[in-house]
Structures are given as structure tokens and as C-alpha cells.
Amino acid sequence: TTLFRSAAAVSVLLAEGRNAQIGNKKKKEQKLMRKNSLIGCLLLWASMAMAQPAAVKNVVNSTLTLTTYTADGTQRGVVPAVFIGSDGVAVSAWKPFEGTDSVGVKDYSGAACAFQALLGADDIYDLTKFSVSAAKVQPLSLGKAAAGEEVWVVPPKQLGAPVKGKVKVADHFNTSYNYYQLYVGGASEKLNGAAVVNLKGELIGLFFQSGKQQSATDAAYARDFVVTGLSQNNPVMRRARLRIALPESEREAVVALLLSNSQKPSDHAATIREFIRKFPHLTDGYYAMTMLALGKGDNAEADRMLQESVAQASKKGEAHFNYANVIYLVLTGQQSIQGDAPATWTLDKALSEVQQANAADPQFIYQHLMAQIIYAQAHYTDALTLFESLARMEPRLPETYLEMAQCKEQLGADNAEVLALLEKSVEVCDTPYTATSAPYFYARGLQYAKMGEYRKAMVDLLRYEYFNQGRLGADFYYQREQIELQGKLYQQALGDILTACRLAPEEVEYHAEAGSLYLRVNRPQDAAEAAKYCIKINPDYADGYLILGIAQTQLDQKADGIANIEKAKAMGNTQADSFLKKLK
């Protein structure tokens, strides 16, 4: 038995030795195969390079490798592209860009370049044009090929070696552009968007393969894409969350600048910088950058931009006006900012700027701002004089008459005189009335209420509400409820205070007002519920206990009612004592 076990052990050892020898041999063979494969690839590349015509060999120097990413940094794909302009303009396939948030770019040598902006896209022909910032740009000239001619598909080195092919059919689309059906052995869909060149090294199109169908679409079609002002809202380009370039035309660029506000904040900022770089003599870019800086709380940068605008803009009046207007809006609370305004921003500074604007180019709008600033300085007589002079000019603005009425009110004019100006402001509004006329109906409505003409006031306030449907806050409905109470319009008042409660459910005073009004219209149960809600929101709110107590006494809960009224008295409510005396 022992001898048998020893023999078996020897047999196992011999088998393991043979297996080890076989394994080592296989490893050597695999290593040799990998080496041969690598050598084969290098030889293939070398042989392909030697097989290419001289003009084709240099095409690779014009290629780019694009890597597209989503917002979270996930890589979407790797795409070939090619330069067609010395200013960094390139073309590629469009589909890989859809859903993309950023693009990494490398040139033929592997050096990183910066993606700048989209210059056009077509999802039907699957082409896009864009710009990159590169240290060295070698654009290809565009050319053509005829049926039967030899062509080459040339991707970046990172995506493979050039592949020779042939034009099967040369056709046209959109009248003047070429479309080629190709036969390219060894090509695949990973080369979609790669350059297809003729034997002169001219770019005839971009390669596409779908199934077994191979083709090239004329790069001239993408070259001729033109961005306009409305391109910022182009539904195809907006499928990629990438910046869209500015047009070359000033007028179109101004439109694009306004629409670029809907892009990502970083892209919007880049568009503003591009605008300032392209059109340093226009005020629009500096003003846009000012508002962007104010939104970020960089108030010093906002001031610097306004100063830069004054220094660089060709229309000095516009630049000074913008400076004055921004200061005025900020100091009067019409433009919110983070932090404190620059120390130099005063109403005197604003007035000086707008006076310089008017001196450079007298305009109604400049004089109007001048009057508004003087009013904000509480110089009401001087402001009124200027507003009156503006009222004699064209265009006749309802705002001017409203501001005259405000001056008169500050100077102590009688109600009839103020009302006459407010009626004039409504009279000069465009008809049929639109939302722009709402402020003038509102101001006249408040003046009617001040004069005790509550029903006329209600008509104007209803118009104001109509023009602002869905945009009014609880404070408006509370204000109108107070006017309705004075006019003894209790049902309308109740509806408005309940609307205020719905819009501001945590505002205890609105619920207390609702409870008080319920008592006035003899609805004690509803009054009690409103009061309980007040106490729930704020247990230390004395009016809530007073209203609850009064409601309870009317609901035959006298003991509880008196207890709550006494609690309101103890909490400092001055009305509680008079109610207690009546009850006792």
C-alpha cells in the first residue's frame, strides 16, 4: 500500500511538471503573438502611410479628436473632426453632440485645445460647425471628387489609420452641394465624422456609415452654416448644452446677446465677453456684464464695467445714461443687489451721469431719468417743472402724468388736482388697454379711495387685478379688502381677505382680519375657526384670543369666551377690557 501511494505521488509530480512546461510554452506563444500583432499594426500603419499619396499624408495634421461629456462628467463618445478655417473653425458629425454639456478637444499631436462655441448644426445631414482655440491650426481646402475616383478616409491617429476607398456615385443635394456614395473597405461607424479627401488632399466631405451604406456629405454644406441672432434659440443646437457663437453682424449680435440669457450661466458670461471683444464700441456688452456682476454680488466689478463703457463706447450718451440708470434703480430699490452698493453710487452721482448723457446727446429718455432722480432727491418743485416740460413733448407718456401727480401730492396739492393728473395718465394709455396700463388704473383707484369714491376705486382695482392675473400677492388683496370695508362692500372684502390668507397662510394678521370680518357679517363659527388658526400659528398673538372669545360668547360658550378675552387682556390687548365690561 505504501509503495502504491509513493508511485501515485511520483505520477502526480510528473504530470504537474509536464503541465507547467506546456503552460510556459503557451505563455511564450501568446507573448510572441501580441508582439507580432503590435508589429503588424505598426507595419500596417507604415504600409498605409507609404501607400498614401503625398498630399494625403499631411491631412492627419488637420484632424481633431473630440470627447463629449454629460453634466456629471460621464463620457458620451469619441468623435473625429477636421479644421476647415484658419481661425479654428472645424466640422464634424452632429449626433454625438446631442445631450452633451462639454467637449474635450485634442489636436493631431494629442495637445489639448479649448472648445469655443457652436457655429451651426443640421440634424438631417448630421453635420455641425464649431470653433476651437488651438495653438496651431492647419485647415484643409475643400474640393470635389468624381465617380470612380480614389478617396481616403482620414481620422485622427487616436482613432485609427487612414483607409482607402472609392467613389461609387457622386450626386447633389440642396442644388449646389455634393453627396457621395462610397466603398471603403475596413471602415466602420466609429469613423463617422472623419475627413474624406481626394488625391489632392482636399476635403470633399465627412464620412458616414449606417449599416452597410457608406457615404460622404459635402463639408461645404457645414462651412456655409451662419449663426444669426435667433440661433440662440435654435431647437437643434439647443439639444447640446454648449455655447452658441455670436453672429458677425452688430444688429444680429445684439439680439443674440439678449437671448443668450437662457443659456448656462457660464456660457452666458462667455457670450457677453465675446460680445465685448467683438464690439467694444457698443454699450450692450458692458451693460449685460454689469447686470451679471450685480447678480453675483460683485458690485465693484459692476461699477468697473460701467466706467469701461463710458471710456470705450462710441455713443457716450448711452454709456452715461446706463451708468445713471443702474445707480438710480439700485438706490431706489427697483434693482436688488447683494451686499452694499459702491460708496460712489449716490443720487448726486446718478444725476451727474445723466446730465452728461443729455449734454452729449439730448434725448427725452435722458431728461425723464433726470426728473426721476431729482424727485428721488426730494426736490419736488424742480422735478415737477421738468416733468411738466416733458409732458409738452412727444411721446406723451402716462408715466409722466403719474409722476406729476406724485409731485403735486408731495407738495400738498388738493385731491382734485392730483386726480386730474391721474385721469390724464389713464387717458394717454394705448387702447385697447393692456397690462402696461395697469399701474395707472391702480394709482387712480387709490386716489378715488382716498377721496371716498369707493365704488370707482373698486372698478380701477378690478382692472388692475385683471391685467395682473396670477401675479399679485397677498398684500394687494389685503389692501383692497381695507378699501372695500370703508365702502361697506363686505362680501367683496371677505373674498379678498380669504385670498390673502390663501396666498400667505403663515401671516397671522390676515387670519385675524378674516376672523374680525366674519364677526361683522354674523358668522361666529367661522370667526372662531379663523381665531384658532391664528393661535396655532402664533400662541402669543393676543388678537387671536380676543376674536375667539367674542365668537364663543356668540356661540353660547360664554365662560370659555370670557376666559379667552381675559387672556387677550393679560397679553396686552387694549380692546379686551371694553368687551369684558359689556359681558359683565
Feature annotation, model-predicted:
Residues 1-3:
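Short, small-residue-biased leader/transition segments that mark boundaries at the very start
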Residues 52, 69-93, 112-114, 192-194:
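A conserved glycine-rich beta-strand in the N-terminal activation segment of trypsin-fold
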Residues 52-57, 136-181, 186-192, 207-217, ...:
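Flexible, gly/ser-rich surface segments that form the specificity/activation loops bordering the active-site cleft
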Residues 53-56, 205-267, 271:
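C-terminal cap/linker of serine protease catalytic domains
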Residues 295, 329-330, 376, 410-411, ...:
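Register position in tetratricopeptide repeats
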